[in-house]
């Protein structure tokens, strides 16, 4: 790729660092669902903008929430229970 046309992307700031949150609660489903895609997978930090420390804590919180059945293991898109007009 020609360097002349290379796009420079600015890294998104970590939402947890900005809010000065040290603990990501696995019972806070509204926060955790923002970081899960329609397939039920955890979104990577390059998309969400999380730093490495908070991405690890987020992954642990999502896994704990799945284990106690607060979050599904698979998303609505795989089950077919999603709004097909949004895709």
Swiss-Prot record:
Write the record's keywords in alphabetical order, separated by commas.
Ribonucleoprotein, Ribosomal protein, RNA-binding, rRNA-binding
Query: What is a single Pfam family found in this protein's UniProt entry?
Result: Ribosomal_S18
Asked if the Swiss-Prot or TrEMBL record annotates the protein with the keyword Cell membrane, the reply is: no
Could you give a single Gene Ontology term from the biological process aspect?
A: translation
Gene Ontology molecular function: small ribosomal subunit rRNA binding; structural constituent of ribosome
Which domain of life does the UniProt lineage start with? Bacteria
For this protein, the record's InterPro entries field holds: Ribosomal_bS18, Ribosomal_bS18_sf
Per the record, what is one GO cellular component?
cytosolic small ribosomal subunit
PANTHER family this protein is in? 30S RIBOSOMAL PROTEIN S18, SMALL RIBOSOMAL SUBUNIT PROTEIN BS18M
Entries under NCBIfam families matching the protein? S18
Q: Which family does it belong to?
A: Belongs to the bacterial ribosomal protein bS18 family.
Q: What does this protein do?
A: Binds as a heterodimer with protein bS6 to the central domain of the 16S rRNA, where it helps stabilize the platform of the 30S subunit.
Q: Which HAMAP family match?
A: Ribosomal_bS18
Q: How does it assemble?
A: Part of the 30S ribosomal subunit. Forms a tight heterodimer with protein bS6.
The protein depicted here goes by the name: Small ribosomal subunit protein bS18
Species, as recorded:
Mesomycoplasma hyopneumoniae (strain 7448)
Q: What is the lineage of its organism?
A: Bacteria, Bacillati, Mycoplasmatota, Mycoplasmoidales, Metamycoplasmataceae
